[in-house]
C-alpha cells in the first residue's frame, strides 16, 4: 500500500495536487512552502480531527488516492465532516460513505477496517496499548508515524539539501 496522490479542493479554487511514487518519497523545500500541510492533509483524510490547512485559503476538501495490491482506494473528506466518501476498485469493498471511528451506532463501514484489510490485517484487531497490557483497537492512524516520517530541525540555518 502506498499513497499515490493527495489533492486539496475548494469551490472556485484550482486543485492543489501532490503525486507520489511507490517507495520512499522525500518532501523537502524552504520554510513555509506547504510541506507540513501535505502530511496534515494525509492525516486528515485518514481521520484526524484537526483541519489540515487554514480555511481562509478557500479550500474545504481533501482527496487521498491510495494504491493497494488489491486495487485503488480514493478517500474524499470535507472539512468539518466526521465521515468520508470512498470510491474503490477493490473487489468486495463497498463504495460510499465510511465512518472514521467505531462507535456503538455506526451505520457505515469503518475506513480504517477497509485499509487494514487491504494490508492483510483482519479486523477488528486489538493491539497492546501500554505496559499493563491494556488493549486498544488498531486503526490505520495507530501506525501512521511509520508510514510518514516528519523531520523538523527548526534551528538549522542552512539546508542540508539545497546549496
At which residue positions do the language-model features occur?
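Extreme N-terminal "head/tail" segments of very large remodeling/mechanoenzyme assemblies
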Residues: 1-75
Amino acid at each position: 500500500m502506498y499513497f499515490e496522490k493527495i489533492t486539496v479542493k475548494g469551490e472556485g479554487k484550482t486543485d492543489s495536487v501532490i503525486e507520489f511514487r511507490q517507495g520512499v518519497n522525500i518532501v523537502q523545500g524552504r520554510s513555509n512552502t506547504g510541506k507540513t500541510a501535505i502530511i496534515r492533509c494525509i492525516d486528515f483524510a485518514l481521520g484526524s480531527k484537526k483541519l489540515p490547512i487554514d480555511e481562509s485559503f478557500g479550500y474545504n476538501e481533501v482527496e487521498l488516492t491510495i494504491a493497494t495490491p488489491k486495487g485503488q482506494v480514493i478517500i474524499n473528506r470535507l472539512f468539518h465532516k466526521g465521515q468520508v466518501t470512498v470510491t474503490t476498485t477493490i473487489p468486495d469493498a463497498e463504495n460510499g460513505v465510511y465512518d472514521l471511528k467505531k462507535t456503538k451506532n455506526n451505520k457505515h463501514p469503518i475506513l480504517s477496517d477497509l485499509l487494514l484489510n487491504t494490508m492483510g490485517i483482519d479486523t477488528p484487531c486489538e493491539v497492546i496499548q501500554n505496559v499493563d497490557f491494556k488493549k486498544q483497537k488498531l486503526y490505520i492512524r495507530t501506525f501512521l508515524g511509520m508510514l510518514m516520517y516528519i523531520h523538523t530541525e527548526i534551528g538549522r540555518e542552512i539546508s542540508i539539501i539545497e546549496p
